[in-house]
């Protein structure tokens, strides 16, 4: 039985994850962390200020974190102090925050950290990598769309796309939304859309002189991210104490 605490328990993702864990026969939802007190499927949710005492009391196997960057760093450090494995789906970390996370995790606890836990998105990333290897002389444009409340832009998933393209194509200049007179350079265009309740759309256009190839992924429900995070939570227990990605979970 895998015991789970959800951080960001009262948010959209936290509620989805809590539901899946609560219904899973091989898992136990033992509580949640958020900015305020509450309940998550009849389990206690405490403020983040009480996280150390809460983890010590509940003794979970895994903490699943979907919060914001600043809060997530503190949650990760607390989990590492208490020997709790981590699933981190929070995005928007600065380079300095990433270094802090690595220092807290490495050698202490296993952690799966990913900008997107959807199985489909991880396959999408693999396809983008393969396309970039074969189409290095094509122009490349990245577009992402999310709901009006998403705080970071570009999305973490889009940033991962750009990292993959940089690895395969070299570090091209990024053109973030074009306006006025433009001239095509050795660059990658990046376009961000925010509106409505869009769960998450990502596409990469490879444009050649005589053809275009577009690789895209569209999420219809946040449950797809929650399901992937819970799958990772099952996988991470008992692993060596270091940072993993969702592609490790999937064996890609």
Swiss-Prot record:
Pathway: Amino-acid biosynthesis; L-lysine biosynthesis via DAP pathway; (S)-tetrahydrodipicolinate from L-aspartate: step 4/4. NAD(+) binds at residues 8-13, 89-91, 114-117. The gene is dapB. NADP(+) binds at residue 36. Disulfide bonds: none annotated. It catalyses: (S)-2,3,4,5-tetrahydrodipicolinate + NAD(+) + H2O = (2S,4S)-4-hydroxy-2,3,4,5-tetrahydrodipicolinate + NADH + H(+); (S)-2,3,4,5-tetrahydrodipicolinate + NADP(+) + H2O = (2S,4S)-4-hydroxy-2,3,4,5-tetrahydrodipicolinate + NADPH + H(+). PANTHER family: 4-HYDROXY-TETRAHYDRODIPICOLINATE REDUCTASE 1, CHLOROPLASTIC-RELATED, DIHYDRODIPICOLINATE REDUCTASE. It comes from Methanoculleus marisnigri (strain ATCC 35101 / DSM 1498 / JR1). Its EC number is 1.17.1.8. It is found in: Cytoplasm. Belongs to the DapB family. This is 4-hydroxy-tetrahydrodipicolinate reductase. It is an enzyme of class 1 (oxidoreductase). One of its GO terms (molecular function) is NAD binding. It comes from the Archaea.
